[in-house]
């Protein structure tokens, strides 16, 4: 991040290279506006619909896979520092709550009803405008808008966790392997060992893992270990 606190960008791409599996040490709010995208976050893979919101916590491995054949890829991406969110949280309101994967019913994906979806979209569009504005008070207006947005997302996440069921595109084998890697990253892991443990042909497992996660098992394990090592520093 180039500026302290947060950064927000509105993108529209007709051409875009492959985005590799990656992570970062800040929070990300991603609003999908248009295009054809599958997005993997840790052990889940989502086919996005316009208006979908992704909440990505620090150090969560994630990767979009984009098809640009018919429509440009449009989205708004907001990055927020952990210290910034802590600064504006209170004993009664923890603004990082919606990102906490340990909360029962937690979801990275918010697929909202039309009215709250439009409200969140309007807040993000306004935040883009205020952030890029030189008008009087735009610095304060942008912070106020950001806090409003985070409060609204936490409210929607709390409601969504009670009734929204995720569509997980990955097959049960890949999901189970991802969960196993996440739980046993510190142990010896190899394609042969995982294929044997889950009673599946190793070539089939390798192909399906690459197809659905967008990277090899070896590279995923390395990335996961790097994430954990950074968290322990």
Regions found by a protein language model. Give the residues of each.
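A hydrophobic/aromatic-rich effector-binding and dimerization subdomain
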Residues: 1-13, 61-132, 151-160
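Short acidic-glycine-tyrosine-enriched beta hairpin
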Residues: 43-57
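Basic/polar phosphate-binding segments, predominantly the helix-turn-helix DNA-binding elements
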Residues: 152-158, 176, 180-226
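Regular secondary-structure segments
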Residues: 33, 121-132, 178, 182-185, ...
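Short, conserved beta-strand element in jelly-roll/cupin
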Residues: 22-39, 55
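All-alpha amphipathic helical-bundle segments outside canonical DNA-binding/catalytic cores
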Residues: 114-118, 131-148, 168
């Amino acid at each position: 991040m180039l500026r302290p606190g947060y950064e927000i960008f509105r993108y529209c791409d007709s051409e875009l290279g492959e985005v590799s599996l990656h992570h970062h040490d800040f929070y990300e709010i991603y609003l999908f506006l248009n295009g054809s995208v599958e997005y993997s976050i840790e052990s889940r893979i989502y086919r996005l619909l316009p208006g979908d919101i992704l909440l990505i916590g620090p150090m969560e491995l994630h990767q979009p896979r984009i098809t640009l054949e018919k429509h440009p890829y449009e989205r708004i991406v907001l990055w927020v520092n952990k210290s910034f969110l802590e600064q504006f949280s209170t004993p009664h309101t923890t603004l990082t709550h919606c990102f906490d994967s340990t909360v029962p019913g937690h979801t990275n994906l918010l697929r909202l009803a039309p009215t709250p979806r439009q409200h969140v979209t309007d807040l993000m569009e306004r935040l883009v405008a205020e952030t890029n504005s030189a008008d009087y008070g735009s610095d304060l207006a942008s912070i106020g808008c950001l806090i409003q947005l985070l409060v609204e997302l936490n409210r929607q996440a709390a409601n969504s966790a009670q009734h929204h069921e995720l569509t997980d595109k990955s097959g049960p084998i890949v999901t189970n392997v991802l969960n196993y890697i996440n739980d046993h990253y510190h142990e010896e892991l190899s394609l042969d060992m995982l294929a044997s443990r889950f009673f599946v042909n190793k070539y089939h497992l390798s192909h399906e893992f690459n197809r659905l996660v967008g990277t090899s098992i070896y590279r995923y394990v390395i990335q996961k270990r790097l994430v954990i090592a950074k968290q322990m520093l």
